[in-house]
């Protein structure tokens, strides 16, 4: 009886431990996976401001390149690739929220013309699915199917992100026309420097909030520092809190000025935005162009044959 109770207790403890671990994993993964897009989605109705600036730049302060490749023209009701490239040095490591170093993640927002949207799974070819990998795209808003977001995802695997896009058909959507359309993209690598509420992350420089002498630097138990600055003129003390993961540039007894950097800049990432143009091509116009080109080629052939025939007639008359 004693043995049975012991085994039962062990089984319950193991089950409880596994359950807790799974819950922690799910919560952590959910918070990480939704972190980047949800900041913009919660605070901005549209990710592109009237000035053309994409709102992700409000949190990711460093400027880095981003590129997008799309076909020059597409036919209605066809699926095409929009490839967003977010280049960076794969050897770089960033400061994570816990103060440790880790690999960079990437994220992107793609703003398509009205009517263009994410292609349904049954319209995506096997070749395109292989390029997409395990990426899961989402609409910026339920009613904004033309704005897509993705991230954060591992940068080492997805520095090139392939969006499968379905072109609209003017025959079924009267708001769409056969025209040249602009599209816009924003892409980031690494964590941001500022949260939407205006507070700093631990992925940026921390400056002195007062000038004076550093009287004390206290290293906190869970990481980070408390720097006490004494103003020599009035003996007023100011304590600056430095989060974990940052490298100090100052020491006790040092004289510093207002806004002087207390830490080095840990940020190795950044945000960039770009644009491209795509033509929604009328199939009848393409057919007309092909017919015209065929007519020109046939006319050239007939002209050459006629010239050959004329030369033969002239040659025969001369021989006669």
UniProtKB/Swiss-Prot annotation:
Q: How is the cofactor bound?
A: Binds 1 heme group covalently.
Give the location in the cell.
Plastid, Chloroplast thylakoid membrane
Q: Which Pfam families match?
A: Apocytochr_F_C (PF01333), Apocytochr_F_N (PF16639)
Q: Any S-S bridges, and between which cysteines?
A: none
The portions of this protein that span the membrane are: 286-306
Alphabetic keyword roster: Chloroplast, Electron transport, Heme, Iron, Membrane, Metal-binding, Photosynthesis, Plastid, Signal, Thylakoid, Transmembrane, Transmembrane helix, Transport
Keyword Membrane assigned to the entry: answer is yes
**Position of the signal peptide:** 1-35
Q: Which InterPro entries match?
A: Cyt-f_TM, Cyt_f, Cyt_f_lg_dom, Cyt_f_lg_dom_sf, Rudment_hybrid_motif
**Would you tell me the Gene Ontology cellular component terms?**
chloroplast thylakoid membrane
Q: List cofactor names only.
A: heme
In alphabetical order, the GO MF annotations are:
electron transfer activity; heme binding; iron ion binding
Membrane topology summary: Single-pass membrane protein
Instruction: Give the highest taxon in the source lineage.
Output: Eukaryota
A biological process (GO) of this protein is:
photosynthesis
Q: Any idea which positions bind heme?
A: 36, 56, 59-60
PANTHER family from the entry?
A: CYTOCHROME F, PTHR33288
Question: Function of this protein?
Answer: Component of the cytochrome b6-f complex, which mediates electron transfer between photosystem II (PSII) and photosystem I (PSI), cyclic electron flow around PSI, and state transitions.
Family of the protein in this entry: Belongs to the cytochrome f family.
Known partners and oligomeric status: The 4 large subunits of the cytochrome b6-f complex are cytochrome b6, subunit IV (17 kDa polypeptide, petD), cytochrome f and the Rieske protein, while the 4 small subunits are PetG, PetL, PetM and PetN. The complex functions as a dimer.
What protein am I looking at? Cytochrome f
Q: Which organism is it from?
A: Arabis hirsuta (Hairy rock-cress)
Species classification:
Eukaryota, Viridiplantae, Streptophyta, Embryophyta, Tracheophyta
Protein's gene: petA
């Amino acid at each position: 009886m004693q043995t049975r109770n012991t085994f039962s207790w062990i089984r319950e403890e193991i089950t409880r431990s596994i359950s807790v671990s799974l819950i922690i994993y799910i919560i952590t993964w959910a918070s990480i996976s939704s972190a980047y897009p949800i900041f913009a989605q919660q605070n901005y109705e549209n990710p592109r401001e009237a000035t053309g600036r994409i709102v992700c730049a409000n949190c990711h302060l460093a400027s880095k390149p981003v590129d997008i490749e799309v076909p020059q023209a597409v036919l209605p009701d066809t699926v095409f690739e929009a490839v967003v490239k977010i280049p960076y040095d794969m050897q770089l490591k960033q400061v994570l929220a816990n103060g440790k170093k880790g690999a960079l993640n990437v994220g992107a927002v793609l703003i398509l013309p009205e009517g263009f949207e994410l292609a349904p799974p049954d319209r995506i070819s096997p070749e395109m699915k292989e390029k997409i990998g395990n990426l899961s795209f989402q609409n910026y808003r339920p009613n904004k199917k033309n704005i897509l977001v993705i991230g954060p995802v591992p940068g080492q695997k997805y520095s090139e992100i392939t969006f499968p896009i379905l072109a609209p058909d003017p025959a079924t959507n009267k708001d769409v026309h056969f025209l040249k359309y602009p599209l816009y993209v924003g892409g980031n690598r690494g964590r941001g420097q500022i949260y939407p509420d205006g507070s700093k992350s631990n992925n940026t420089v921390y400056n002195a909030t007062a000038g004076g002498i550093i009287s004390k630097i206290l290293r906190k138990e869970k990481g980070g520092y408390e720097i006490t600055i004494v103003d020599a003129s009035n003996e007023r003390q100011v304590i600056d809190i430095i989060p974990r993961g940052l490298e100090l540039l100052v020491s006790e007894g040092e004289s510093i000025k207002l806004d002087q950097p207390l830490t080095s800049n840990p940020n190795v990432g950044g945000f960039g935005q770009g644009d491209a143009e795509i033509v929604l091509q009328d199939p009848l116009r393409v057919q007309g162009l092909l017919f015209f080109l065929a007519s020109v080629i046939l006319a050239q052939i007939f002209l050459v044959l006629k010239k050959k025939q004329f030369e033969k007639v002239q040659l025969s008359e001369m021989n006669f």
